[in-house]
Swiss-Prot record:
GO terms for biological process: L-histidine catabolic process to glutamate and formamide; L-histidine catabolic process to glutamate and formate. Disulfide bonds: none annotated. Belongs to the PAL/histidase family. CDD domains: PAL-HAL. There is a cross-link at residues 142-144 (5-imidazolinone (Ala-Gly)). The gene is hutH. The modification 2,3-didehydroalanine (Ser) is found at residue 143. Coiled coil: none annotated. One of its GO terms (cellular component) is cytoplasm. HAMAP family: His_ammonia_lyase. It is found in: Cytoplasm. This is Histidine ammonia-lyase.
Length: 509
């Protein structure tokens, strides 16, 4: 198993993606000294006896209740058990694994006050593939992702359930099989495990990873559709995009030029083409997809900062033995980033669906109706376009900003929340919808290109065409369409379409 070394504050987009895709994670050696110093500071604060939130007081609205020294361990266990109140379907294992690594990285900064044993338990569970079962619903994104992180923490103390290679078993049993002893929490540790934005951030990053793959796939299918409709590459001229100046627009224009370079199909209508301008879904790809790229990068920058920061409360400053209460648990930046990704996913699918609709309409594409050689007897791509329209409409509904919502909790002590978890959790479903739309476009565009034989497209797009045809044959007559759609969508989701094309395409990280 690949192991990513967690260097707190210096983790890259690629590092987090590797963990999401199955790598384990281990703290860099230097982080353990920071953890030890922070834990020692908590011990000195406890010995001093002054009331400090989360160490010797109650939580939330009960912060004014002082807790006796003999009850401090019980206090931390109680917060884990009482806050493990999530509901809904289990979160995807890759998301939970990433959440655990994000929490481990946060502890490694040395501002949470946890002991070495607590961080080591997270590290050991990651190394052994012990992934807590975490219900997906229950967080409002402040005070942190309390319920989801409580389910993670519960597994660490031997309560709840753990996924071990797809087998769900009681946490205590899974820990015993891995020769791990359930944690006994010390002062501040229960709160440190629960307080933070790691669940929302993990879900948002997962959505961003999928969005990047989708974005690159859609550049390829967009170029294929342009070829199928005998569209012009003139709108991708770099002089146009230089005058406007947006970086994403310039990069997308360049990518489309690269993808279409050397096309015999394009050369066949480069002179005396009666069409002066293409529909927006072809002509404005650099403007639309460039804006998508810029938005994804902005979201990525925000999540990169969040993933490398500390969203605990209170924060422990070991050099002065201070515990400062603040609001780093408020996930507003993550909520905004998730909303950006949702909008981007929506637009990737939206413009692709318009290209599909254009291709099946002979008045717009010049191709046979619904891309079938014998329309009437055959319906061809009639209903796949309807499916794409349905999926795009569903994503439009889901793209409503989560961050504009708020609801008071904890007896109005926590009176403004981010809804980051809600905003981030929807992203994988939206990515699934958009993947299916791009898969349908891949089928439709390659079908359209087949009508131009023996003319060939560019080397890059011919590689994409061959890759699809190695899985799905040309549609000569109507057949069961669902398997074709599933196969094409799998090429999009896996990233294999992008890998098959010999071109460097812009991305987030």
């Amino acid at each position: 198993m690949t192991v990513v070394t967690i260097t707190p504050g210096a983790m890259s987009f690629a590092d987090w993606r590797a963990i999401y895709e199955g790598a384990s994670a281990a703290l860099t050696v230097g982080a353990w000294d920071a953890i030890d110093a922070s834990a020692a500071a908590v011990a000195r604060i406890v010995a001093k006896g002054d009331p400090v939130y989360g160490i010797n007081t109650g939580f939330g609205k009960l912060a004014s209740v002082r807790i006796a020294s003999d009850d401090l361990a019980t206090l931390q266990r109680n917060i884990v058990l009482s806050h493990a109140a999530g509901t809904g379907a289990p979160s995807p294992t890759p998301v939970v694994r990433l959440m655990m690594a994000l929490k481990l990285a946060s502890f490694g900064v040395g501002a949470s006050g946890v002991r070495r044993e607590t961080a080591a338990m997270l590290e050991a569970m990651l190394a052994r593939g012990l992934i807590p079962v975490v219900p997906s619903q229950g967080s409002v994104g402040a005070s942190g992702d309390l319920a989801p992180l409580a389910h993670m923490a519960a597994a660490m103390i031997g309560v709840g359930k753990i996924d071990v290679g797809g087998a769900i078993m009681p946490a205590a049993e899974a820990l015993a099989q891995a020769e791990l002893t359930p944690l006994e929490l010390g002062p501040k540790e229960g709160l440190a495990l629960l307080n933070g934005t790691q669940f929302s951030t993990a879900n948002a990053l997962a959505g961003l990873f999928r969005a990047e793959t989708l974005f690159r796939s859609a550049l390829i299918t967009g170029a294929l559709s342009t070829e199928a409709a005998k569209g012009s590459d003139a709108p991708f001229d770099p002089r146009i995009h230089a005058l406007r100046g947006h970086i994403g627009q310039r990069e997308v224009g360049g990518a489309l030029r690269t993808l279409m370079a050397g096309s015999a199909i394009r050369a066949s209508h480069a002179i005396d083409d009666p069409r002066v301008q293409d529909p927006y879904c072809l002509r404005c790809q650099p403007q639309v997809m460039g804006a998508v790229l810029d938005l994804l990068r902005q979201a990525g920058a925000t999540l990169g900062v969040e993933a490398n920061g500390v969203s605990d409360n209170p924060l422990i400053f070991a050099d002065s033995d201070e515990a400062l209460s603040g609001g780093n648990f408020h996930a507003e930046p993550v909520a905004f980033a998730a909303d950006m990704i949702a909008i981007a996913l929506c637009e990737i699918g939206s413009i692709a669906e318009r290209r599909i609709a254009m291709l099946v309409d002979p008045a717009l594409s010049g191709l046979p109706a619904f891309l079938t050689p014998r329309p009437g007897l055959n319906s061809g791509f009639m209903i796949p376009q309807v499916t794409a329209a349905a999926l795009v409409s569903e994503n439009k509904q889901r793209a409503y900003p989560a961050s504009v919502d708020s609801i008071p909790t904890s007896a109005n002590q926590e009176d403004h929340v981010s809804m980051a978890a809600h905003g981030a959790r929807r992203l994988l479903d939206m990515a699934d919808n958009a993947s299916a739309v791009i898969g349908i476009e891949l089928l439709a565009a390659c079908q359209g290109i087949d009508f131009h034989a023996p003319l060939k497209s560019s080397d890059a797009l011919e590689a994409a065409h061959r890759h699809l045809r190695s899985h799905v044959p040309t549609l000569d007559d109507d057949r069961h369409f669902h398997p074709d759609m599933e196969a094409a969508t799998a090429l999009i989701r896996s990233g294999s379409l992008v890998a098959a094309v010999p071109a460097s395409l812009p991305g987030v990280g």
